[in-house]
């Protein structure tokens, strides 16, 4: 719904494993129900039913709790239930997400992880599915029929030992999870502020990791799957809601994760952690992607500041930076399908077109500052100085998410991609490697959010080679097939290229769709340039070969822009070549034959689109 193209999104929680153990490798749902329904998959009984659901609540924190109680045989059986749902926003927003539940036996409450990106929640509700429930209570270490349990145990012992000994010295995931990132991003000028204008802010300390250490409940294991030692799925217990339909209620809030902290926090100028938590809760229960919502609000706030829209258009809301109350009201309107919030719920690409058509906005300006690629809002990192992450956003198949190529840390913090060739090669390797996790239902965090003590001494520390070896053991241990790291990448490469071709069939998947809004590459406005004038002037002298002293700010911006766009074009060429694609970003016939995906319709599509 958001990109009009191919989408996949992954989430933690119990649904995926329970579905597999119940006997299903995949679930395909065709058609549209005549009334609201719940699909119930009882793995214990070997039965699937479709049941009418006219009275159950729609928002996820209520619905999942009710269904968990309904379909569990007793209180102990609640941990055997997982629910997929999308809240009321899914009836109105293009970027509605899915909530996947699990039952926290220590808290005795239902919790969630999200498949957030791309609007899959909208698809669920369009089919009039209120929820999918799976039950499976027979789980053991043998449930997935492993071929060699000792190999799996070997990998487990190694990673669990590292987590126990090193996590507190590295990212402290077990206490604050991805909440450790805001101060690092702020320090390196990478924290998005005011719709990605800036990368740091004086009030960023209000969103510091120490704040989340205090707000997250400590002392309770927080893994979103059995046996996860990293246990990073933190939450805020006993949170008092201040707004919306549940005002005054005390709730458990899952998160916030970094993307939410930076999105509905710094990127819209909100540095109140309690406001961030409140928006986190309502985005979750309504079924709203926090990244897309945050960027849509940030874009609207910048357009409000620029005079493109005003209070008459926003229904009286003052969309100024830092107005958390206005942002929350937009969120509640979005969920109801009312007011200006309903427009915000359609995403940045829609807002750009709407503001040009209805309010006479400058098309170039809104294109430059509307932070989306392929219709998907950009994840919450400032990329002006990271050519690698620019490629990570622009060249990603699905749009500008960080699932395929989260390179910002290795590029800008650890400085592991110093050369142009390093960046181009990373954009070939990491999308394939990271796709492999999604294909196999595995979390990426035990791969690179904890690393061996000697990782820096390895030949390729950015790949964490010891952990790559872990996954070859896991694959062989489960399937009985011995594999190398190259074998794992080949699995992904077939899927990755096929997905690019499917996008091509749908009218996308070429070079023209791989460009970024310029703000992701460099400064758009004089305000931005002057905020980092020393840096940009130095780059003009040293990299572009231009003396900036005689130039106006506007001329400096134009010269720098021409240089940075040319660098990005060069990067596209280098990455396409490594991927086996032509200069237009289309997989070649040679590549699809090499991968064994040269089906007749694939060959015909490539010939049709390339003319040869």
Q: Where are the regions that the model predicts?
A:
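Extended C-terminal regions of large enzymes
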Residues: 1, 68-612
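Glycine-rich, N-terminal phosphate-binding loop and its surrounding beta-alpha-beta segment
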Residues: 1-29, 49-81, 86
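Glycine-rich phosphate/pyrophosphate-binding loops
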Residues: 13-46, 126-142, 289-291, 296
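Long, continuous compositionally biased terminal/linker segments
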Residues: 41-54, 603-605, 609-612
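Compact, glycine/acidic-enriched structural inserts
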Residues: 44-48, 60, 154
């Amino acid at each position: 719904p958001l990109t009009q193209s191919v989408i996949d999104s992954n989430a933690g929680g119990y649904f995926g494993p329970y579905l597999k153990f119940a006997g299903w490798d995949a679930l395909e749902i065709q058609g549209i129900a005549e009334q609201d329904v719940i699909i119930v998959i009882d793995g214990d009984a070997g039965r699937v039913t479709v049941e009418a659901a006219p009275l159950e609540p729609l928002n996820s924190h209520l619905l999942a709790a009710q269904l968990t109680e309904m379909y569990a045989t007793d209180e102990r059986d609640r941990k055997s239930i997982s629910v997929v749902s999308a809240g009321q926003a899914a009836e109105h927003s293009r970027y509605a997400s899915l909530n996947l539940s699990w039952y926290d036996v220590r808290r005795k409450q239902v919790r969630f992880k999200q498949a957030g990106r791309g609007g899959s929640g909208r698809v669920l509700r369009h089919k009039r599915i209120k929820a999918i429930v799976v039950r499976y209570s027979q789980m053991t270490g043998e449930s997935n029929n492993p071929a060699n349990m000792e190999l799996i145990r070997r990998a487990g012992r190694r990673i669990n030992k590292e987590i126990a000994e090193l996590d507190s010295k590295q990212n402290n995931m077990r206490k604050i999870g991805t909440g450790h990132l805001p101060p690092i991003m702020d320090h390196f000028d990478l924290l998005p502020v005011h719709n990605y204008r800036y990368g740091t802010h004086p009030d960023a300390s209000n969103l510091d990791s120490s704040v989340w250490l205090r707000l997250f409940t400590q002392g309770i294991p927080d893994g979103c799957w059995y046996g996860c030692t990293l246990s990073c799925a933190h939450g805020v217990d006993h949170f008092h809601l201040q707004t919306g339909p549940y005002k005054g209620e005390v709730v458990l809030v899952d998160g916030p994760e970094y993307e939410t902290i930076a999105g509905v926090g710094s990127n819209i100028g909100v540095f109140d952690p309690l406001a961030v938590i409140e928006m986190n809760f309502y985005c979750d229960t309504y079924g709203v992607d926090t990244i897309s919502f945050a960027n849509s609000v940030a874009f609207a706030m910048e357009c409000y500041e620029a005079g493109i829209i005003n209070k008459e258009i926003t229904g009286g809301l003052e969309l100024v930076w830092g107005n958390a109350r206005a942002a929350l009201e937009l969120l509640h309107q979005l969920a109801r399908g009312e007011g200006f919030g309903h427009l915000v719920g359609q995403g940045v690409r829609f807002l750009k077109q709407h503001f040009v058509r209805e309010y006479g906005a400058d098309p170039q300006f809104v294109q430059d500052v509307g932070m989306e690629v392929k219709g998907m809002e950009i994840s919450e990192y400032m990329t002006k100085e990271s050519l690698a992450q620019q490629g990570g956003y622009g060249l990603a198949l699905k749009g500008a998410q960080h699932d395929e190529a989260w390179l910002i840390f290795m590029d800008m913090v650890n400085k592991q991609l110093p050369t142009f060739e390093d960046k181009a090669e990373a954009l070939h390797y990491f999308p394939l490697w990271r796709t492999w996790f999604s294909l196999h239902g595995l979390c990426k965090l035990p791969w690179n959010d904890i690393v061996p003590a000697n990782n820096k001494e390895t030949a390729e520390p950015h790949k964490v080679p010891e952990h790559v070896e872990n996954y070859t053991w896991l694959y062989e241990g489960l399937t009985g097939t011995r594999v190398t790291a190259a074998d794992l990448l080949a699995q992904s490469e077939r899927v990755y290229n096929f997905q690019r071709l499917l996008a091509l069939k749908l009218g996308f998947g070429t070079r023209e769709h791989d460009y970024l809004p310029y703000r992701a590459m460099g400064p758009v406005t004089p305000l931005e340039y002057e905020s980092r004038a020393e840096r940009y002037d130095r780059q003009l002298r040293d990299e572009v070969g231009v003396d900036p002293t005689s130039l106006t700010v506007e001329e400096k911006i134009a010269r720098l822009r021409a240089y940075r766009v040319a660098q990005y074009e060069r990067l596209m060429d280098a990455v396409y070549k490594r991927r086996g694609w032509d200069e237009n970003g289309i997989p070649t016939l040679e590549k699809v034959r090499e991968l064994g995906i040269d089906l007749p319709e694939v060959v015909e599509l490539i010939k049709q689109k390339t003319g040869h």
